[in-house]
Amino acid sequence: MRLISATSALLLAYLIWGSRAWPLIHDAPLMHYVAWLIAQGGVPYRDAFDMNLPGVYLLHLAVLQVGGAGDLAWRLFDLAWLAAIGALLWAYCRPVSDAVAAGAGAALFGLYHLSGGAWRAGQRDFLLCLFLLAGAYGVARGLEQPDGRLAFLAGGLALGAGMTVKPHAGFFWLLCAAVAAVGARRAGRSAGRAGALVLGGGLVVPALVVAWLAGRGGLAPCVAVLTGYVLPLYSQVGRVSVLGATRWHAWGRATFGLLAGLGLLGLRASPAWSPRLVLAALGALYGAAHFALQGKGWEYQLYPLALFLCALAPAAVARRADGSRTRPAADLRGIRRAVALAAWALLVLVLGAKGVEAREPEWIAEKARRVAALTRDLAPLVRPGETVQVLDTTGGGIHALLRLGLRQPTRFIYDFHFFHHPDDPRIRALRAELVAGLAAHPPAAVVVFEESWPELGYDRLAAFPELAQALERSFPLAVTGPGYRIHAKRSDS
């Protein structure tokens, strides 16, 4: 195991060094832009139509306030968050394995993260992992201590913070409360108090965030977006099956096949009741549901599953689990550890190969060049105080506005809302809002990106005739760039 650990550490250092120049890219600039709007006095959901929860904006706002909107600040934040997860993962796994195996588990998660490439840096599901693991750790410590009230409460607080990033974390919060109650009763303590502390702690941070949102005037718009769009409409867009999604994840099936195998071996090596392994196993089940329920098939939504499988894996390679000998029936006739070591070594090789492939992919470089080109093209077209409307998803349009410090005349930071469920009255209302906003407050330019989601190509505007007519009437084509078109406002409009 020491050889595998040393190899993992060297590979991790290599990937960290290789990631030092990763740019702020893909989804992250969108969340940065919403955070920037908030810093400028904007109101979430009223001034930025988005599907994410306020906790995401607050984290990005903290990054902007401390380090600014540049690539380096984002890179340092992502690595610091990864280091925090790694340290907590080591502390979580150490009592059910050994120091070397726990360190290897932390390195394994680091390899998983860095093997994804620049676009996965700071993704919301990755940020969620720290809160999920802190919650599980708090509950485990509460069961291990004679008086675990503060630990139960701290675990609940962490899980509540996670729910402000992704609401699906609420399922794991309930599971952790149940484990706290069952474990406390097994120890002859109050099950109700243990569960209530986790549940009560989980309400604190969401309540504070809701209060902040209400104070900013964003609570009603948030509820309207969630109930009028996200739940009934967005949740149905682009849904794919779990197996179908993993076909286009690079090394995805190999990675999770090996991780799942290590997790199962870790469970087989455990005593009948180990709160840390029980919580990790439930976390893995939650992680699978977290991916399946979202239904989009995006690779970064697998982070919680990867996290908890990495938490289970060290027990599979430790010579002893929980300080006791492994049960003979669980040892697979004496070859459990050898099988686990072989699987671990293969997984490190797989993640290394994936990481090398993802270090400098052409599509990331192309997107960065597109952002730079659009920034140059827009700068001479926009006077101080003017706005620009972008019709894009993650192509880089909003990123260019962030660099230039430009606002939009409407709240729409994406355009995909307008092209699914076109006959639904709620989508028609969003379309009408966009066209009315462009007419009431004409921007200096409208930027149409060729790539969007789920519809591709400039021809998608034909399905939105009111917008196409508005562009033809008031915003003639001025610049054709790499993957975008800039329609500048007529001088007489």
Regions found by a protein language model. Name each.
Residues 94, 99, 135-154, 181-184, ...:
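Membrane-interface transmembrane helices that cradle and orient dolichyl/undecaprenyl
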Residues 87, 251-287, 313:
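Hydrophobic, aromatic-rich transmembrane alpha-helices
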Residues 141-160, 189-200, 275-285:
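Short hydrophobic alpha-helices at membrane interfaces in multi-pass membrane enzymes
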Residues 174, 364-421, 434-457, 487:
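Short periplasmic/luminal acceptor-recognition loop of GT-C membrane glycosyltransferases, typified by
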Residues 171, 288, 294-330:
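Hydrophobic/aromatic-rich transmembrane helices and adjacent perimembrane loops
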Residues 89-111, 129-130, 145-150, 276-278:
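Transmembrane-helix signature of polytopic, membrane-embedded enzymes
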Residues 150-167, 173-178, 203-204, 284-292:
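Membrane-interface alpha helices of multi-pass inner-membrane proteins
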